[in-house]
C-alpha cells in the first residue's frame, strides 16, 4: 500500500493499513440495501429503528417488496404492531425464534448498540446464512461534524445517538470481525456519509 504521512510519526507496529472502497459514496442508502437484498432471502437484525419507528421511512418496510423473503429480528417488539401490516414476512424478538436459512443477514447500525459485541456476533454466526452485511458509524467520516470541545467551559460535545456504546473505524471494524468470527471479510466501504459497510462470507 502507498506510504502515508502518518508513517513517519508513529512506530510501524501501530500503523494499520487496509483497503476501503469509495464506490458507495453519495449513493442512496435505501438503494444500496435494495440492490444487496434484491431477490434474496434476508434476515434483517434491528428492523424497527428503535426508539423512533417511522413506518413510511423504515428500511425494513422499504426492502419488503424486493426480497424473495424478508424476516426481521428486534428486541423492541413493542413496534411490531405498527410494522406488521406493511410486511409479508415474520418479525422475531429473540434469536431462538430464528430457525430458517437465509442468503443474507443484514445488520445495519446495530453493532454499536449491543452490550457484548462478541456474543452478538456469535448469535449472528448461528443463523444459517451464507453472507453477513454490517454497517456501523464511522468515526473517521464523522470527526469534523460530530465532535467539538469548548476549552473555556471544558465541555466536550459529541453528536451521537444516546444509546451508542462506541464508534468504529475501518481498522477496528475489520479487527472486530476477524477477532470474534471465522468469516471471510470481502470488503469494507465508506457508506452513507457517516458509516462503514462490510460484507462477509461465512466459512461454513
Give the residues covered by each predicted segment.
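A short beta-strand submotif of the Rossmann-like class I SAM-dependent methyltransferase core
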Residues: 104-110
